[in-house]
């Protein structure tokens, strides 16, 4: 019985670590893309990474909290994305955010 409980605890811990690694990987991937497109310096890249990681963590939290309530989940996720834009705009400036928006629009056409 003790082994079973220990195994269950280890599985939960492992799943959390894997999920965190996945979020870190997503944040790194999008940060690298933004850095390449906008030619960010090291400080800007660090800020973008932190903003993106927090965004992904918030999204996971909201999806877990409202998994059975799509009507509430949708507006909560929209709030996260609006805050994301504001934080990125504050960190990078209006011109770079416009450049990023233009890039996203362009790749959307392809």
What are these regions (language model features)?
Residues 19-110:
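Charge-rich (acidic/polar
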Residues 1-24:
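Bacterial Sec-dependent N-terminal signal peptides
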């Amino acid at each position: 019985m003790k082994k079973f409980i220990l195994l269950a605890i280890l599985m939960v811990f492992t799943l959390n670590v894997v999920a965190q690694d996945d979020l870190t990987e997503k944040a790194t991937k999008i940060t690298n893309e933004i850095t390449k497109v906008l030619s960010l310096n090291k400080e800007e890249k660090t800020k973008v990474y932190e903003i993106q990681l927090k965004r992904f963590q918030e999204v996971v939290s909201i999806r877990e909290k409202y998994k059975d309530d799509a009507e509430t989940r949708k507006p909560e996720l929209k709030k996260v994305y609006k805050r994301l834009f504001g934080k990125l705009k504050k960190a990078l400036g209006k011109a770079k955010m416009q450049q990023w928006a233009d890039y996203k629009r362009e790749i959307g056409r392809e």
